[in-house]
From Swiss-Prot:
Subunit structure: Interacts with MAP3K1. Interacts with FBXW8. Interacts with CLNK (via its SH2 domain).
Cofactors named for this entry: Mg(2+)
Taxonomic lineage: Eukaryota, Metazoa, Chordata, Craniata, Vertebrata
Originating species: Homo sapiens
A GO molecular-function annotation: ATP binding
Compositional bias per record (Basic and acidic residues), positions renumbered to this chain: 333-348
Protein's name in the database: Mitogen-activated protein kinase kinase kinase kinase 1
InterPro entries according to UniProt: CNH_dom (IPR001180), Kinase-like_dom_sf (IPR011009), MAPKKKK (IPR021160), Prot_kinase_dom (IPR000719), Protein_kinase_ATP_BS (IPR017441), STE20/SPS1-PAK (IPR050629)
Binding locations of ATP: 23-31, 46
Amino acid sequence: MDVVDPDIFNRDPRDHYDLLQRLGGGTYGEVFKARDKVSGDLVALKMVKMEPDDDVSTLQKEILILKTCRHANIVAYHGSYLWLQKLWICMEFCGAGSLQDIYQVTGSLSELQISYVCREVLQGLAYLHSQKKIHRDIKGANILINDAGEVRLADFGISAQIGATLARRLSFIGTPYWMAPEVAAVALKGGYNELCDIWSLGITAIELAELQPPLFDVHPLRVLFLMTKSGYQPPRLKEKGKWSAAFHNFIKVTLTKSPKKRPSATKMLSHQLVSQPGLNRGLILDLLDKLKNPGKGPSIGDIEDEEPELPPAIPRRIRSTHRSSSLGIPDADCCRRHMEFRKLRGMETRPPANTARLQPPRDLRSSSPRKQLSESSDDDYDDVDIPTPAEDTPPPLPPKPKFRSPSDEGPGSMGDDGQLSPGVLVRCASGPPPNSPRPGPPPSTSSPHLTAHSEPSLWNPPSRELDKPPLLPPKKEKMKRKGCALLVKLFNGCPLRIHSTAAWTHPSTKDQHLLLGAEEGIFILNRNDQEATLEMLFPSRTTWVYSINNVLMSLSGKTPHLYSHSILGLLERKETRAGNPIAHISPHRLLARKNMVSTKIQDTKGCRACCVAEGASSGGPFLCGALETSVVLLQWYQPMNKFLLVRQVLFPLPTPLSVFALLTGPGSELPAVCIGVSPGRPGKSVLFHTVRFGALSCWLGEMSTEHRGPVQVTQVEEDMVMVLMDGSVKLVTPEGSPVRGLRTPEIPMTEAVEAVAMVGGQLQAFWKHGVQVWALGSDQLLQELRDPTLTFRLLGSPRLECSGTISPHCNLLLPGSSNSPASASRVAGITGL
């Protein structure tokens, strides 16, 4: 560690101060509220952890600036301590917090309040600049207010001396949204001076008026790129009629693009906005009173007008009509439906285990379907009743007991529907196969194959008429195969009209959940609960959902709008509402803005459709939205835990929009959005009609093609796109060429397939009355489930719902493995089982 300033005390600051609470984090460390043990005065202690090889020159610079700055608008410095590899900086405590903390509760400041703040900040900047210092990070979060309503500049972690040889800084530092153009282009233009603080003050004035700086929903790297362009226009206030001409002029002058023409802090103090009479601390005291009593003032609402939220007509909690296992084991009465389930070539299986095993979460796209084809697994149908052809049917098991004593039922017991369970359906249990037939045990003795923990439908109630109970069928020879249950029931009697689903794992409990976007709102289903229950999270029509990093994106509202929700916040609000039921009030009327769990994404009103694709290896996933006259592309930005705007292309989309999917190619920085597909030319299986974001102008193919039946485009790998078109499924590259290495890149469907999904390296095709499973890259039909009394519907590309042809209610099922997150986002349902 470098030599520390001699004025830094080498002792524990806690000998002099009592730490009261953590206030937050600064540029280099954490900030605590503390009390002087002698005087009782409150102070702020900034703690920075040090490493032996750390260069403390930057921190010494901050300390030096604080020590040498004595001004009414700059936080006072009280001393520094170095103890146990931690540097503590003691400074003035501002009890009201930062302006950012304040406006997130109170809403935007009035023009007079903004004028007073700007005047006080300009006075502090004029002093700093006279001392040859630049702040370089002026923003709402670094402007503090004390309990007396006084304004203080804080956080000098990136301040710099302006010496005779350092008049032009050559470092790239600051916050992009508040950054001056010359700072963003420092590598091109050669440096900047103290006037960059004037630009930041102008952006801060807009922030206080509009609750966020301009371009705040745009990716920060995109903001830097825009500011370095020659055609960049400085931002202005959005609502011209709301603010005075003096305020508009103040913004125009402070945001002068050329630093040579931008006025200094001293000159700006004579501006009409900040020199008007009536600017005093009373304006800020009124703001603090509103902060302490938010109910007195008007509600802050959202950035845009909220649609009126009406009490939902559907209950907030919906219980399954039958209890189901937390592992998703199907109800035993599933066996009572006459499903035709054809065993096709290569599908001999062994009897499965009678319990499911939870698997660790896995990303669907992290495993290649083609690689999965060559893998082997001992997992079998451990969660489903398997109908088989009559000629292969083993002796039937007795009917399921209804948890009555054995003497209450005989061997001829009837099912719930008054009919004997069909013998064509069987359920297998785990256990060693019998070596030879032998008499069954007496009623008081447990079966070697069935125990009290076995599935109730497998129990064999003792009979007074039979000498021995029927034996379980012997195990067949194991055939190594990939896959598990085709459908696993999760919920019975779902009344929701579901449009989309997403999977989510709770970060603390690790419980797996399903998030459902429906006409009635957003609901959640905990797959680990003993009793399946759907609980409402958001009472607004939702047609699309997607979860990432505990954030739920949704397309919600009567007029569709893209929303961002905190899933943990939605759950907490649900529990609060359940514990204290009150009249339905929009959450925006109850919560501070910083605590809002549901916020609208700006400029996405009227969004027609959304889709998501994985980003490049260095970036997060992309989200694309189809607006009325344009297409917007957003990308996940991990430091801010949100999607930010990357590009927007003005383009009139077709109506109806039958295809809307993102396509990413190897080496491409930005994806293209596919809005149509047609048969290809020689050498190409299909021709994608795309809108490209990277080119100067977008390209669109001929859109006059009419298709026979549904059309679907889904990218399943970086170099593989699955296209359902004209009754067949084609596996092509993002350019439309057939995928190499596949025996059959085009699979003709034998039914009127409406949607397809890739599950566990196999192709699942869903049609009106059934499901087909095809081998990837071949015309081999591996498995089929059909029932003319049921209607299946795929929710999105990898999601399934199945309902009765008459009843509007449905049961939720999972296709594929019952516990993998890949199958967790595929939901199905069956009625009348």
